[in-house]
Amino acid sequence: MVYGIIGENCSGKSTLAEGIKEAIGAEIITGKDYLRMAKSESEAVILFRKKLESAVSGENLIYVISEPEQLVLLPNDAVRILVSADIDTIKERFKTRMHGNLPAPVAQMLEKKHGVFDSGSYDYRFDGVRGDMSAFCESLKEKEDKR
């Protein structure tokens, strides 16, 4: 099965991806990591789409998406999970990632992008701040075991 974990920077996507990986066993591919699959971007996209399509009914694969243009790579049958966080939490996490400094232009960029995924269609919505990751991952595992 393919799990698309979708959300803004610092919303909790990678943490959730690791939890799901541990619960069901899966490969994680983040953002444009698929570019390593080939020398050219166009060839890498083709190979990655094939990998995703074969994973829909095969081995588990988690694709972590933080840019809207990456959504087109997800197969129609993928499980789509939106991970969200409030803007203050996102800024604080980003500040930590940047060693305690959040320049004003970066803060403005985060504010501008906030909510960019909210209107999409998702199978699940997970709160990356207050969500119970253990319970969520266990629920996915139970559904995976029934497949």
What are these model-predicted stretches?
Residues 76-96:
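Conserved phosphate-donor/acceptor-positioning beta-strand/loop module used by diverse small-molecule
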Residues 14:
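Walker A/P-loop
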Residues 17-57:
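Conserved substrate/cofactor phosphate-moiety recognition/catalytic segment
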